[in-house]
């Protein structure tokens, strides 16, 4: 059985060589993430060019995702490598541009002293160090250390429950987006999205640089993003549940419930939902995952996530290939236990369906009734395939498209196996070509039942209006 839940791997120093990238693709990497919070353009371009060379030589549609640094707040540098803070210590954050020491450190946001108040909690390094604001004196925020720890330069700052008036895009983000357009990235994973206007701002920048065909995945990382999830989902092409910062900004115990709710909303929209952060975190150091991590990945699959993601496990861990292999095994085992018919019955068609809704729903129902081996979907923009897969059919969906960009973008959609095809000029040819491609790729064999969907006029996005069910017969092609 073909794996339906897709896997994203973050590239980094641990997978620098073309040979390692080839091994990742063979093992099951569907998309490669480039984390622009680290490294410069030259470093990322080197990895990107290697990946493109490898995926082209293997003829595999591996998508590329540029993950922005986003409008975050960090501490700046110290006069030593690191400092140690203990509970009860007094420690100061300042918006002045000074070199830090054991008593104070500068922050990257120049207006932080205007937006915090006495009594507020400030978390540093994903909450490993906790401060309580005592008083504000000019540009200095004097705090008491509540949870001590070791601090080094450039660690993140979170202030739970406080809306900080940061811009949606920084100058670095704009430069990075331009780089993504110039180098043909498939997706922008936009960090710290708080409202739909943030997504629209990114679309404007993409349009300015000629990147209208790059899709936006909004990362939900704070309470404001959670509160505005419906409008963000509407404005975006996909959602990432970024559980690292999200679990710092809101109580960690609430994250599993939010994960389920966000995935459920994404399912209804047909847009891909990525579950990310610390999924197999122990495999950065160890060759096997913990039992809790195995359960975490499996439960994301049971929730219906489109993708699961590896971050530090593949970017900088000691066991990148083993981490991916472990994730593939967990996903496949979890998928085998899913009752797709029961799941399909839960995913009702929309209250006011259009023709496309009815056709894609009927495709899945017909495939279930006939126990079809595959659904074959001719799609110009990729939307038809995504709309089919929101109903989570038991069989895989072969998506035929004439655009290489669309082929790669479909690589992160649940259950979709995208193929590139030439131009066609008749519906009969669409149907026969769909079967030919599925046969060639080994998805079906002679005697299998398939359900095919397409639309007329040919080549027009959103025109899906035809269904055909047939037995595969090579002699009739």
Spans of model-derived segments:
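Non-catalytic helical/linker scaffolds that mediate oligomerization, partner binding
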Residues: 1-477
